[in-house]
Amino acid sequence: MESLSSLYRDHIATLQQRTREILQRQQLEGLLIHAGEPISRFLDDHDYPFKVNPQFKAWFPVTRVPHCWLWVDGVNKPKLWYYLSIDYWYLVEPLPDSFWTPYVDIVPFADPDEIAALLPPRDNVAYLGSSPHRASLLGMERDFINPQPVLDYLHYHRAYKTDYELACMREAQKSAVNGHRAAKEAFLSGMCEFDINIAYLSACGHRDTDVPYDNIIALNEHAAVLHYTRLDQHTPEHVMSFLIDAGTEYNGYAADLTRTYAAQKDSDFAALIAAMNSEQQALIATIETGVNYIDYHLQMHGRIAKLLKQFDILSGLSEDAMVTEGLTLPFLPHGLGHPLGLQVHDVAGFMQDDRGTSLAPQSRYTHLRCTRVLQPRMVLTIEPGLYFIESLLAPWRANTFGRHFNWSRIESFKPYGGIRIEDNIVIHDNHIENMTRALKLE
């Protein structure tokens, strides 16, 4: 594989080309990209964990240092004003010296309020960042603060990963897979959710503030809460299932993986997990360029109908009728997946072009996060689920179609919560790369 340095050189060239294009289109002279500022807790002297502007970390892996500024014009070498505070209370991140630093001019400064005097004139420059107030203090007018046409263009093209970005995402997969394996062992040894999470973080080398989203570590019926993050400190008396949805970051790029396990390998739930895994892999085998992601979401509902019929959860209707009448929806209430990259739910999932044209999902699939036609270099998650959630099932009990639900069978599955299996894939011209399965995470 090429060195990260050479991949990064080409990555910067791509970002520079995109910058030239949008500056010319909007008649701008440059982009001023702000890393962001710490946010203090209300009536407190502590800050929330700092999360960098994704538009900033697209250019280089500076993810922990607030108050930094980047100036790009698509022609000259990108210029980074790097916040190097003088502080004895907190650790000061040293001036970077890494594979990416030869491609950037770095200017250290110690006082965030100095920046106005350090920056070039800003009369025809767009500010991209989370602090419009700071931009106003720099004399920038409202129309130049996060202008939508600039954001639309940059967001749209972020879907197409450079080779550098793909290399970073493959590295993120490796650490996430290490964490998932450690978490599975912790589950099998009888640990509680809290301790399973610690095992995961330790294996990944991440703190809980480093992971790209709050880990979902769910035993038993907790798996029926889609974004369950409580982390119980007591192991249930009868452990039946384990769902883990957890990721990592590498150079600012995310991995997002999910697996579900049964405590008893000979249970019906274990068989349902195995069948779901087969359907997920079969769906991935059908993915190709030029097809809208919506089509695969609809295909998965057909596969869910097949499972519901196979396991006697629904009966008396064809699989097509189950989908048409919405009977699969309470079992799979979320979308098939989403774009992945600098953010877990990466931007522009609905954008059809780089001018902001949006295509919303069908009204019955409001939680689908991607309606784009799949093209090479896109990275997406494929994460079908099958859950037993009473609040979603309850309306069907008195419904005309309620007789098609095997309610006693559903009650027997409720203590397991549900299933989700998630891989991260890359679209290539002639094949689909499953980054997760390539590392043998089963």
Curated annotation (Swiss-Prot):
EC numbers: 3.4.13.9
Matching InterPro entries: Creatin/AminoP/Spt16_N (IPR029149), Creatinase/aminopeptidase-like (IPR036005), PepQ_N (IPR048819), Pept_M24 (IPR000994), Peptidase_M24B_aminopep-P_CS (IPR001131), X-Pro_dipept-like (IPR052433), X_Pro_dipept (IPR022846)
Gene3D superfamilies named in the record: Creatinase/methionine aminopeptidase superfamily, Creatinase/prolidase N-terminal domain
Cofactor names: Mn(2+)
Disulfide bonds: none
Binding site for Mn(2+) 1: D256, H338, E383, E422
GO molecular function annotation: aminopeptidase activity; metal ion binding; metalloexopeptidase activity; phosphoric triester hydrolase activity; proline dipeptidase activity
Binding site for Mn(2+) 2: D245, D256, E422
Keywords tagged on the record: Dipeptidase, Hydrolase, Manganese, Metal-binding, Metalloprotease, Protease
Family: Belongs to the peptidase M24B family. Bacterial-type prolidase subfamily.
HAMAP family, A to Z: X_Pro_dipeptid
Protein name: Xaa-Pro dipeptidase
Organism: Sodalis glossinidius (strain morsitans)
